[in-house]
Regions:
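Short, conserved DNA-binding cores of transcription-related domains
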Residues: 1-87, 92-93
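Short, positively charged, Gly/Tyr-enriched micro-motifs
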Residues: 60-153
Length: 153
């Protein structure tokens, strides 16, 4: 069943476990984490030690039926056990970029929505649960629109 949910959410990561699913009003909340496996340091090949977990709340607007989908992702922090190396890194998910609060598919869905010239950035922002400034930045990041020259007097 977990594989079906992962395919439905357009998440292609085989190491992810769905630990819990909640529905609270018009918000669906899915708790995700990676399977625990032995990690080795990419720098010195020593065994890594888990230094704890932290939680990220990710907006994943794949549902367009009036529900808001939140992914609660639990990531582990890893530290190298070699005292000369001491490398730190975190679990990585291929559908979330570093430091982002929305999934990687969100900008493409926003750009697809912005094709309609009758929709404002505020309307798109409300639909995807982000700020209108973020919609504007996404639009400018992916589209290179040249300015028209000023008219001569």
């Amino acid at each position: 069943m977990n594989n079906d949910i992962m395919k439905f959410l357009n998440i292609e990561d085989k190491d992810i476990i769905i630990s819990k699913i909640l529905i609270d009003g018009n918000t669906k909340i899915i708790y995700l984490e990676k399977t625990l496996k032995v990690e080795y340091c990419p720098a010195c090949s020593s065994r890594m030690h888990s230094k704890g977990k932290y939680i990220r709340k990710i907006n994943h607007p794949i549902l367009q039926d009036g529900y808001q989908l939140k992914l609660i992702v639990t990531q582990r922090k890893w530290r190298c056990t070699n005292p000369q190396c001491n490398l730190y890194f975190n679990d990585q998910f291929n559908f979330i970029s570093k430091y982002k609060q929305s999934s990687n598919i969100t900008p493409y869905m926003i750009l697809n929505e912005m094709k309609n010239i009758h929709i404002t950035t505020a309307g798109v922002a409300r639909k995807y649960n982000i700020s209108d400034t973020s919609v504007h930045y996404i639009f400018l990041q992916y589209l290179n629109i040249k300015r028209l020259p000023l008219p001569e007097i």
